[in-house]
Structure formats: C-alpha cells, structure tokens
Amino acid sequence: MEERNRTAFIQNLLKLVAPGTPLRAGIDNVLRAKTGGLIVLGYNSEMMNIVDGGFFINSDFSPAYLYELAKMDGAIILSEDGKRILYANTQLVPNNNISSSETGIRHRSAERVAKQTGNLTISISQRRNVITLYQGEYRYALKDIGVILTKANQAIQTLEKYKAVLDQGITNLGALEFEQLVTYSDVIQVIHRVQMVLRIKQEIQNFILELGDEGRLITMQLKELVSNTEQEALYLLKDYAKERTQDVKKTLKELTTLLNEDLLDEQAIIKALGYSRTSNFLEQPASPRGYRILHRIPRLPSQIIENVIDEYGHLSSVMVATEDQLDEVDGIGEARAKMIKDGLNRIQEQLFVDRHI
C-alpha cells in the first residue's frame, strides 16, 4: 500500500512539473539563474497560519513572472493548480517541532511546510542545481532530463527482452492448449512473465511523465511493444480462473500490487486465480475456456465467443465440435462456423511452427 501511494504521489506531481508545462519552464529559469527558490502550491487555512509578510500578487502564472519573483528571497505561493501567482516574497514559519531529514534551510523549510499543510512544496537549490518536490511525508528529487532519457532507453531495451520471452511463453502455452497438455505450472509461469512486463511498463510510464514533451518517442516505442499485453493478460486470467464470473480486472490489479518477492511465490498467483493452496496443484492438468485463442480469430465478436464458451465450456470441446454443431450455437451461422474451424486450424499450425520445444 505504501509503495502504491508513493507511485500515485509521483505520478500526480510529475504531471504538474513535467518538461513542457509552464510551471516547469519557470522552475528551469530559476534553476539556470542560480537564485534558488521556494514555491508552494495551494493556500489553505493551514498555510495562512505559517505565512508571514510578502506581497499579494493574484496574477495569472507565467514562467517569466516566476523567474523575476524568485530573485527576491521569500517563498512564492501559487494556486493549487499552479495557474495563478497568489503571493511573493513571503516568509514561511512552519512548526519547528516537525522532523526534517534535510540540512539546507530552504529544503528543511520546504519539507516542514509540506508535512504541516499537505501542500505540494518545491525547493530549488541555489548551488546544487537540484529540484526537490515535497508533499506530506513524500519527497522526490527531479532528475536531469539526459539521465532520465538514458534510464528510459535502458528500460525500453529491458522491456523488449522481457516481451520477447513473454511472447514465446504465450506461444508455447497456446501449443500446449491445442495438445491438451497444459498444467497450472505452465499457466503461472506465463502470468509471472506478464506481470514482469507490466511492471517495467509502469516504470517507463513514470519516466515518460517526468520527461513530458521530451518523452514522445519513448511513448511511441512503449505503445508498439505492449499495446495488447494487458488485454492478453485478461483473456489468460478468464481462461484459467476457477470461476468464470471472477472479476479478472480486479485480479490483474491485485497481482500488480504484489511485492516482487510475493510475485515469485507461485502460491500467491494460485490464490489470486481463486484456487486453494495444495502441494501438488502445479502439476495438475489445466483446461482453458478458450477466450485467448478464440479472440485471435479475426472478425469474431466478443458476444459470439461468450456464446461458444457458454455452449462448450472449454477450448478442447470447441476444437472437436463439427461445423454443423457450431452452427447450432446462438449467433453462429454456417459462414461463422466455418470461420471458427478454419481459424482454429490456422492458429494451431502457426503455434506448432513458432513454439520452442
């Protein structure tokens, strides 16, 4: 939960101060001028108690105004959305009893103000060229764009490797499904790989938020790599969850919140699928319902797939059904029945060619 809250904090803040936003342009101007600065977003009742002196500005925000006002020693107070400058050259007097891990006066004041008020507080270092964000108990230092780009590119390369391993795992699983040789161990291995890919994706999305306008190419690469991974994961969970009515979106979210060490625990994934923990469960045969494979057949609507699974229950039963039998399913005519049979045969042939033995 703590890690999730911190991730949400970072994501919300980075949207405000990402490159390309007016606030970030103003902050960068202050950083380059080496004047330092202390900026608080929001003026609530708690803020009123700690603000002393200064000038009431109440003007629309602009990067140039922020730069000029930062030349004065005091703190600048903006509206909560950062679109208006409310006060300038104010002295902030937070409660000295609030603990702070910072050493510099400006950073210490920023941390205490953030803890006391819950407002976003931005401290711009005069000498170290560092921008630090505080809100409540959270602290985040913005990194140099070049450093972030390097890390984002490294993460994309890592994602490519993990995605290739995942794709091969899904191909192998598909081949086993047609041979009716799947065990829960095979399924859990693929779910684990899906989660690793989704976690790297989340990390790259944080980099993209921090890069702002500079992250367009990274965004395009990310979409190209993992555009269908989440949907594939949902079909996989629908295939193997104990109950067909299980909310697989909720299950996927629960798996995403597992700690890395818990994700390696196969029993945690078994529990998420709705099964009880037993010692030999992993080696038991698993029979997919067929959502993932049937969705690979072009122009086959989701409702028709639901009707097929309502009728047959599992992929193995669909595979042995004749065209005439499929024709009797609600919504499936002669043409669709032929399309399903041909589609399954084509997918099976392709999977057998592509899989690694």
From Swiss-Prot:
This is DNA integrity scanning protein DisA. Homooctamer. Its cofactor is Mg(2+). It is an enzyme of class 2 (transferase). SUPFAM superfamilies: RuvA domain 2-like (SSF47781), YojJ-like (SSF143597). ATP binds at residues 74, 92, 105-109. Residues 7-145 form the DAC domain. Its EC number is 2.7.7.85. Keywords: ATP-binding, DNA damage, DNA repair, DNA-binding, Magnesium, Nucleotide-binding, Nucleotidyltransferase, Transferase. It catalyses: 2 ATP = 3',3'-c-di-AMP + 2 diphosphate.
